């Protein structure tokens, strides 16, 4: 049997920079809770065997928070095992995937709940690129992430918030999600980082600590992360054509 692919969405954070009285992933965007869009994108992909949504232990099911009708037809399993950090939530989510039958050689695609612009086409592009990364030995494929080349000129500030230097943007990419790795390799990478007290801001950072070099796969500016209050207006514009289009479109 070929290796399967699972999605994992850590959803236990508070999103304080985005403002609002509820976590940003629960705030409305174009008539739907933000988290709906990621769940819809993965649900529309036949390549994904199952999706695990990792919530905080004291959270409530999405169906109780918003009503069951909103999530009707979406394929996902909820795990109330989220930790204090993304690192901890992903690690707990990997253990939950094992309970769903995921093996160490299966793939996991970890996605930010606050990236509602994800489409099935982006997911398929990532899967195709990662699984064909080593045609001579498919089992040796390391993994990869969606990302976009940095288009702007970057400035490094000095202590006085003045320009200290200009950072060459050649070869710089802005990491996005999903980030796709073998379940066992990612679990080991996260456990090693935790044991070393290392700060890893995404899954690829943990993989890099093992001396591995994940593949960069072209993503989309549409797949940006909603971080600040003003980002909601942009998300509304991108997704305002309707929830069905946001789930099915590759734009």
From Swiss-Prot:
The record marks 17, 24 as: Transition state stabilizer. Its EC number is 2.7.7.60. Keywords: Isoprene biosynthesis, Nucleotidyltransferase, Transferase. It comes from the Bacteria. It is an enzyme of class 2 (transferase). The keyword Phosphoprotein does not apply. PROSITE patterns: ISPD (PS01295). Gene3D superfamilies: Spore Coat Polysaccharide Biosynthesis Protein SpsA, Chain A. One of its GO terms (molecular function) is 2-C-methyl-D-erythritol 4-phosphate cytidylyltransferase activity. SUPFAM superfamilies: Nucleotide-diphospho-sugar transferases. The record marks 169, 225 as: Positions MEP for the nucleophilic attack. One of its GO terms (biological process) is isopentenyl diphosphate biosynthetic process, methylerythritol 4-phosphate pathway. InterPro entries: IspD, IspD/TarI, IspD/TarI_cytidylyltransf_bact, ISPD_synthase_CS, Nucleotide-diphossugar_trans. It catalyses: 2-C-methyl-D-erythritol 4-phosphate + CTP + H(+) = 4-CDP-2-C-methyl-D-erythritol + diphosphate. Pathway: Isoprenoid biosynthesis; isopentenyl diphosphate biosynthesis via DXP pathway; isopentenyl diphosphate from 1-deoxy-D-xylulose 5-phosphate: step 2/6. PANTHER family: 2-C-METHYL-D-ERYTHRITOL 4-PHOSPHATE CYTIDYLYLTRANSFERASE, CHLOROPLASTIC. Belongs to the IspD/TarI cytidylyltransferase family. IspD subfamily. Catalyzes the formation of 4-diphosphocytidyl-2-C-methyl-D-erythritol from CTP and 2-C-methyl-D-erythritol 4-phosphate (MEP). This is 2-C-methyl-D-erythritol 4-phosphate cytidylyltransferase. It comes from Cupriavidus pinatubonensis (strain JMP 134 / LMG 1197) (Cupriavidus necator (strain JMP 134)). The lineage of its organism: Bacteria, Pseudomonadati, Pseudomonadota, Betaproteobacteria, Burkholderiales. The gene is ispD.
């Amino acid at each position: 049997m070929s290796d399967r692919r699972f999605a994992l969405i850590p959803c236990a954070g508070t999103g304080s920079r985005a403002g609002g009285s509820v976590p940003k992933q629960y705030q409305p965007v174009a008539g739907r809770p933000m988290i709906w869009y990621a769940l819809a994108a993965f649900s529309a992909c036949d390549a994904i065997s199952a999706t695990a949504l990792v919530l905080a232990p004291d959270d409530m099911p999405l169906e109780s928070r918003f009503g069951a009708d909103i999530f009707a037809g979406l394929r996902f399993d909820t795990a109330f095992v989220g930790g204090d950090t993304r690192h901890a939530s992903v690690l707990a989510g990997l253990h939950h995937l094992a309970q769903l039958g995921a093996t160490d050689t299966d793939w996991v695609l970890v996605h930010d709940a606050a990236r509602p612009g994800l489409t099935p086409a982006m997911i398929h592009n990532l899967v195709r690129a990662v699984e064909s990364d080593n045609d001579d030995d498919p089992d040796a494929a390391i993994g990869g992430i969606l990302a976009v080349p940095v288009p702007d000129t970057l400035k490094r500030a000095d202590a006085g918030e003045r320009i200290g230097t200009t950072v060459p943007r050649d070869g710089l990419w802005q990491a996005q999600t999903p980030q796709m790795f073998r379940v066992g390799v990612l679990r080991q990478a996260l456990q090693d980082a935790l044991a070393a007290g290392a700060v890893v801001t995404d899954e690829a950072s943990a993989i890099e600590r093992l001396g591995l070099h994940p593949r960069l796969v072209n993503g989309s500016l549409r797949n940006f992360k909603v971080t600040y209050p003003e980002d909601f207006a942009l998300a509304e514009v991108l997704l305002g054509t309707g929830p069905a289009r946001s789930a099915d479109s590759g734009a």
